[in-house]
């Protein structure tokens, strides 16, 4: 790899708007930051066609038994771990389906692991441990777009035949060149020069929100805008589950509780039972036949 040259990276440029941020009032300081943050959504908007393409291709691969795996270092890696960790409780998927790998391992989530991001070989080792296949998708996260760990991971994933996607915040980056789909919201120089946990991190989080949410919608994990595969693992989520059943079916809380008790708090099954008027076993068979899509299962009944 060529010698590191940060001065040409947008993420490392000095922001002329914030040069005097250390001299202004606290209110003016946060106003400046807020104004800079407003630029993030606009940068992401320019990448929507690529994000949509990624969602469709990832969902297709998951239907074939694949997984979604994020790899990154530092803030980017942590964002991948964060997004992956939210999928099981929100959408009822296994912890294997969406995974986050951070350079340096789990310890690096809480404390920077010096030098880990500079090793392409480490990424290869980490992905080999996951036994990736051509049905998997590897999303490389690197605000700078030059992280060796991410480059190595994407290059190896491509050799295996997996779908490769990059999420960076600099145009025409080395990381992007290794990806089949390159998503690059260019948010401009950071409020604090080079601190990519700020706008760049926010942009990456927005992109990951779209990707994981879009994929889960494509997998039938959402009915209307309700998270129907929610795992009710605590009191708050139990009450949320009841509310979801009520909203989806129009029944009251008492009836929703009764339906959920019958299904061992399988929210989707409870909703489909109420809407289809089928018993538990019949409803489960019909849902399974339609790969868990409530709308498709209901349409099949209506067409008879």
UniProtKB/Swiss-Prot annotation:
PROSITE patterns for the chain: GCKR, SIS
Pfam families from the UniProt entry: GKRP-like_C, GKRP_SIS_N
InterPro entries listed in its UniProt record: Etherase_MurQ, Glucokinase_regulatory_CS, MURQ/GCKR, SIS_dom, SIS_dom_sf
Sorted UniProt keywords: Carbohydrate metabolism, Lyase
Gene Ontology molecular function: carbohydrate derivative binding; carbon-oxygen lyase activity; ether hydrolase activity
Tagged with keyword Chaperone: no
Occurrences of domain SIS (ranges): 58-221
EC number of the protein: 4.2.1.126
Reactions performed catalytically: N-acetyl-D-muramate 6-phosphate + H2O = N-acetyl-D-glucosamine 6-phosphate + (R)-lactate
Active-site residue numbers: 86, 117
GO biological process: amino sugar catabolic process; N-acetylmuramic acid catabolic process; peptidoglycan turnover
Pathway per the UniProt entry: Amino-sugar metabolism; N-acetylmuramate degradation
PANTHER family hit by this protein: GLUCOKINASE REGULATORY PROTEIN (PTHR10088:SF4)
Additional remarks: A lyase-type mechanism (elimination/hydration) is suggested for the cleavage of the lactyl ether bond of MurNAc 6-phosphate, with the formation of an alpha,beta-unsaturated aldehyde intermediate with (E)-stereochemistry, followed by the syn addition of water to give product.
Subunit details: Homodimer.
Cited function: Specifically catalyzes the cleavage of the D-lactyl ether substituent of MurNAc 6-phosphate, producing GlcNAc 6-phosphate and D-lactate.
Annotated family: Belongs to the GCKR-like family. MurNAc-6-P etherase subfamily.
Protein name (database record): N-acetylmuramic acid 6-phosphate etherase
Organism this protein belongs to: Clostridium beijerinckii (strain ATCC 51743 / NCIMB 8052)
